[in-house]
């Protein structure tokens, strides 16, 4: 398995995987997520692929077939009155094809993101995970992540 930057040719597979992630969210919180949709359009993906601020890494097999991805966002705080200056690599989305889960592809992607964050001089790697996605929460805890802050809600 090779981890590389995503390219335009990967967009169809990224779209397919985005549908998989969205389905998990829509099934868990149909009051928030629209059924049968995805997070990004092809046009939005094309823009993200061109930006150094939003690196997308893909795990590909020996046939260059995209088995998973990690969408990232480089963030930097500088000169804030209350927060320390710091660089962050935020994982916006991490997905492994549901047919290939359990093969450590997610771990490879996560470790690649960590290595890139270190190379970029980041203080930490952050992400959000929906409480409905317990397998993802367990995976991230196994990777050594711990809660930074918690968003709470009261449905009215």
Predicted segment positions?
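Conserved beta-strand-loop-alpha-helix junction that forms the acyl-donor binding cleft
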Residues: 126-136, 153-156
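A short helix-loop-beta-strand connector motif used in the catalytic cores of GNAT acetyltransferases and
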Residues: 43-58
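Conserved GNAT-fold acetyl-CoA-binding loop/helix
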Residues: 23-45
């Amino acid at each position: 398995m090779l981890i590389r930057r995503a390219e335009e040719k990967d967009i169809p597979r990224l779209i397919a995987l985005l549908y998989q992630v969205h389905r998990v969210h829509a099934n868990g919180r149909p009051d928030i997520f629209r059924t049968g949709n995805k997070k990004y359009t092809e046009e939005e993906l094309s823009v993200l692929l061109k930006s150094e601020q939003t690196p997308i890494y893909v795990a590909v097999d020996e046939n260059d077939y995209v088995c998973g991805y990690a969408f990232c966002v480089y963030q930097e705080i500088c000169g804030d009155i209350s927060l320390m200056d710091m660089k962050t690599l935020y994982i916006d989305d991490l997905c492994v094809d549901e047919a290939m889960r359990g093969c450590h592809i997610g771990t490879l992607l996560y470790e690649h993101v960590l290595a890139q964050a270190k190379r970029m001089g980041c203080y930490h790697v952050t992400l959000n995970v929906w409480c409905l996605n317990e397998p993802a929460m367990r995976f991230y805890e196994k990777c050594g992540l711990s809660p930074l802050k918690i968003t709470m809600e009261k449905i009215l």
